[in-house]
Amino acid sequence: MLLLLLASSAGGQTVSTSSGTQSLTPVTVQGLAPNNILPTSTDVSDAFGLDLLVTDVPRSISVITKEELQNANIQTARDFARVSADTYTPYFNGNPSSTYIRGQVADTFFNGIRIGFTSEGVGAPIDFNAVESVDIVKGPAPAVYGASQDVGGFINLITKQPYSDAFHSEIDATFGEYNENRYTIDFGGPIIPGKLSYRVSYSGEESGSFYRNVFTQSQSVYAVLKWTPSSNYELELLNSFSEIHYELNRGINRPTQDLIDNGTYITGREEFVNPTGTPIGPNYPISNLIPTTIPQNRGVVVPTGTTQIDRADVIVNPNDSSYAKTDYAEAIQRLTLSDNAQLLDTAYFGYLNRWQLGSYHYSALVEPSYTLEDRLELHLNNDVPVSRPSLDREPELSKDEKSVLDKDETGETEGWSIGNMLNLGLDFRYQRVYSVSDISHSYNNLFDLTQNPSLISVPLSSILGGKNPSYAVPGVNGFYGTPGGTYVTSSGKVINTGNGESNDTWAEDYAAFIEDRISVTKQLAFFFGIRGDILHIDFIDPVHPAGFNPVTAHTTQGLINVNGNVTYQLFPWATAYFTYDYSTSSTDGQGGGYSIGSDNKFDNPDFRNGSDLYEGGLKFSFFDGKLYIATAGFRQTRSIPQEGAPTLPEIIWGGEAELNFQPNRNFYMTLSYSYLDPVLAQQAPSQKESSVLAAFVPPVGTGSGSPNTVTLPPGNYLQPGIPRQLFNANLNYVFDFGLGFSFGAEITSPINLTYGGSVVIPTQFTLNAGVFYRWKNVELRVDVLNFTNQQNWAVVSTNNGTNQVYPEMPLQVQGTIRVKF
């Protein structure tokens, strides 16, 4: 509360009101008008840490307003592909917690603070109850935030603000096919007019699903209190709590091209057989008809024929379940020292408790984890005079008279001055993560989904013995996991190989940063940022074999983030920019913790995941900002994490174009297009099997067994799971008498399911439409999602394409009633 004390001491001071082009904006946070979708109508201070218009931000950025979130029906991390370029997201493990940007898991921020708690997009689903708008920024996070391994981009969730003018309330209820039931209550207003205001939002869901045995039950509460005791100080306290019980949906297994094209599914059960046909036991089966170096607990499938599968029949046992509880709290203080100086302090607490449990013995547990962070920023905005007309010839003039002569006819200061926007600060983050997973025993292809779903199960005995066994998680009944460390006997026998996910870690991150935007002229500006982090980590293995001490490891590492940018206003309506960004980051374990290498140490290469980004673009603002167009092209080097395998370097090229047009309050249109070329050049990626056919005995397959992780030969591989091209469009029109229509389209180019492209999802499209009527304080709305009932598919995981594929939702009708008071 240092800023509060400073504000108290300055309470009797009067803040200067002299004009200046670089003066700071008032502390009051201004939002967009309710139906405005134009990025040009507000600043994006949380994108780069400075109060900049979207045309001045040297990066590709999308601003998704409340109006767009509602009309495009944004409910999950995947739905951003409906409204923004380069945001196609796989169904990672059936319920992604993070959006993908430019083909990689994106960072998620909460009012400019990294939430964390995710690895490869696995974690608690995004809770939109607290969200007012979303900034989607392409490329690594800037110096003020520090980069992570997720350098494709980040989304920043901007929370709801209190109502300071009068009391407002809103009740929403949505009902839809497949037993969908969602509801929200939102209210707030001033407590002390002009001084103290609040807002509270509650949302809940009690929904079934189109998919067999899948459901969602959630409760969320958000509250914010804003106190403005003086004109130069503001305190905002907020808390977002969410609890969700849901089902992990991993899609359909045995993804052949015939399944994708025609819905044809190969039937048959896992059989433990050898070449003579003699049955054998499950613990060390000689089930592979082709020799392998991994005689693990796996089997082969004896095909019995083919059938047209019901797309609702997914890999879910009725006894499977998932759970997540999150709590994010912030205290945001703003102290205006003068027109040109402001202190901003953001204190954050994050809590996560989650688990995912499948009867096929995929499990993930985070129990619990929490983060404490405090970031202090000093913003200094000044005009530095370089030259101006001499007034020495007028010595008899007073100071005020000289000031008048020092202005031109427009009121602007004559001469040349350099504008400077400076942000410097300190950041401390403490993180505690306890996380255990078992990713070694997921035998997806061995289950026949046309049979009783209760048979989707792996016996506990089969994961407790054999190679790389699982162990009971201490203090958590019914959960088993494999170690994060590697355990070898004195004779050299490997008992366990570290899974790269399980970790019990304590981490402290100390950082300092500086950002400086120098406006050399009204047209030309340079922007520099640098941040240095000192990261200390203590690791202990949460599970380990009997007779062994748990593996421990410690490290202290330095990380750096540097970026340089230039913007040039070609015309009043056109701005060009170029950016270069270099960063190093750590390799994350599950739950946002840190994993160790196969040598049971923190390997230096795991803290040298380098990223280089070169990006250039043009931004246009026509008709007083009512038409906004942005284009960008980029080249980036980065690292791609693999499940249970080393990260891989990747080079990507791409381009994006976005258009926002809103000529009046009745109509708006958004369009976006992106092209991405993510290539792993001369790399040897790992994959669950060489082909889906490895699971089947000849003549249908090779009979090598499943799972049977292979390392592919070195070569050039297109990253699977991501379309090279994505296009979306959204149109909305409302008549003056209240009737309105909305339309949305999303088109994806072919998507490889595997690295070799043996199975390909073809070009697909999804069309959504809605009709609504607004009368006074009531809105009635009907949405038809996928109204052409396309039988679309999506990737579940970038390296599990031989095991599973996700059937997208069919046509669905939803009805919403919204009442405001």
What are these regions (language model features)?
Residues 129-132, 144-222, 229-235, 327, ...:
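Outer-membrane beta-barrel translocator/receptor signature
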Residues 378, 387-467, 499-638, 652, ...:
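Structural signature of Gram-negative outer-membrane beta-barrels, strongest in the C-terminal barrel
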Residues 195-198, 232-237, 340-343, 384-388, ...:
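Repeated loop/turn-to-beta-strand initiation elements of outer-membrane beta-barrel proteins
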Residues 209, 226, 232-334, 342, ...:
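Acidic/polar loop-and-plug regions of large Gram-negative outer-membrane beta-barrel proteins
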Residues 25-166, 616:
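Acidic, small-polar-rich N-terminal luminal/periplasmic segments of exported/outer-membrane proteins
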Residues 409, 626, 632-637, 647-756, ...:
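Gram-negative outer-membrane beta-barrel transporters
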Residues 678, 748-754, 773-821:
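C-terminal beta-signal and adjacent terminal beta-strands/loops
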Residues 174-182, 204-230, 234, 245-249, ...:
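Outer-membrane beta-barrel proteins
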